[in-house]
Regions:
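Positively charged, low-complexity, intrinsically disordered RNA-binding extensions
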Residues: 8-95
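Short beta-strand
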Residues: 1-3
Length: 95
């Protein structure tokens, strides 16, 4: 470690190929957990809508419209996760 008077400088060695692969696996697992969470929210939302329909609070047309909207939001969020994963993997593998 070095000291330039105002900051402590700590040299960090470059990542090895093995460590890069480990980080990629970690990123992949985090993104997969995110996808699962998004799908669980979708499932819960659709389940709640169906319960509302069974109770007679909401019409079938409104249920279908909201299910489609929930699916669009789900697809959008999963696409964002995929984009983030691709960007991060490229960043990690960059030498």
């Amino acid at each position: 470690p070095g000291n330039n008077g105002t900051a402590v400088l700590v040299p960090v060695p470059p990542l090895s190929e093995e460590r890069r692969q480990e980080l990629n696996k970690f990123v992949h697992q985090l993104v997969e957990d995110g996808r699962i969470a998004v799908r669980n929210v979708r499932r819960d939302g659709i389940h709640n809508l169906q319960n509302m329909q069974k109770d007679g609070h909401v019409s079938e047309d409104l249920i279908k419209d909201n299910e489609l909207e929930i699916q669009k939001i789900t697809d959008s969020n999963i696409e964002k996760l995929n984009t983030l994963q691709d960007d991060k993997e490229k960043e990690i593998l960059e030498v």
